[in-house]
Amino acid sequence: MAHHKSAKKRIRQTERRTEVNRARVSRIRTYVKKVELAIAGGDSAAAQAALQEAQPELMKGAQAGILHKNTASRKVSRLVARVKEMKSLA
């Protein structure tokens, strides 16, 4: 257990940041899941709309330091490719 005032403060800050980051990660996963469900369902319009919502969330996560920027870009790229492939098959 921390005894110094500054160490106690750091613990409080870490707990707050952990909560915020956990919420952000959950939000990102939810948006990505919506895209994947739309792709699995075969609904290209819904997949495109979900992708338009998921892309900014992923990039905001990268900007906030939750995801590495390359990871966010890779996820966006793969989702875009899957939606594009789905459109071409339909």
From Swiss-Prot:
Ranges of Basic residues composition bias in the record: 1-11
GO MF, one annotated term: structural constituent of ribosome
Comp. bias intervals (Basic and acidic residues): 12-22
Entry annotated with the keyword Ribonucleoprotein: yes
Keyword set includes S-adenosyl-L-methionine: no
Residue ranges of the region described as Disordered: 1-22
One GO cellular component term: small ribosomal subunit
Pfam family, one: Ribosomal_S20p
Superkingdom assignment: Bacteria
NCBIfam families (UniProt xref): S20 (TIGR00029)
Entry similarity comment: Belongs to the bacterial ribosomal protein bS20 family.
Listed name of the protein: Small ribosomal subunit protein bS20
